[in-house]
Amino acid sequence: MGNIFSPTHLIVILLIVLVLFGRGKVSELMGDVAKGIKAFKKNMKEEGELLEDKLEMSDYSKTTDVRPQQSQPLSVKRAAERRKGSSSFKEGKASVAKKQRGK
């Protein structure tokens, strides 16, 4: 009496369920339960694969760390080029002037 789920109690419960629902309905319910278990296992497997794919993608993102290069606007670059060009032009004039003085 201490154990509620003894084998004899389970058999009696199964017989009552069989009588109430009928043989066809019980087999249909068991089929539905089996389909549910299969669908659950399939979804768990797909979820595991998605998790593995995400982990692989995160590994790739760590290895391909691309940093953007800083660039200056064109107006700043052109101004810098003009300064360089004008200073070399001035240096050229100065060297020509020195040569002429030396003569």
Curated annotation (Swiss-Prot):
Record-annotated membrane-spanning stretches: 1-21
Keywords: Cell inner membrane, Cell membrane, Membrane, Protein transport, Translocation, Transmembrane, Transmembrane helix, Transport
Region (Disordered): 60-103
Principal subcellular localization: membrane
Annotated InterPro entries: TatA/B/E, TatA/E
Gene3D superfamilies: 1.20.5.3310
Membrane topology: Single-pass membrane protein
Gene Ontology cellular component list: TAT protein transport complex
Subcellular location: Cell inner membrane
GO molecular function (one): protein transmembrane transporter activity
GO BP annotations listed: protein transport by the Tat complex
Family: Belongs to the TatA/E family.
Free-text function comment from the UniProt entry: Part of the twin-arginine translocation (Tat) system that transports large folded proteins containing a characteristic twin-arginine motif in their signal peptide across membranes. TatA could form the protein-conducting channel of the Tat system.
Subunit structure: The Tat system comprises two distinct complexes: a TatABC complex, containing multiple copies of TatA, TatB and TatC subunits, and a separate TatA complex, containing only TatA subunits. Substrates initially bind to the TatABC complex, which probably triggers association of the separate TatA complex to form the active translocon.
The protein, known as: Sec-independent protein translocase protein TatA
Species, as recorded: Bartonella quintana (strain Toulouse)
Gene name as annotated: tatA
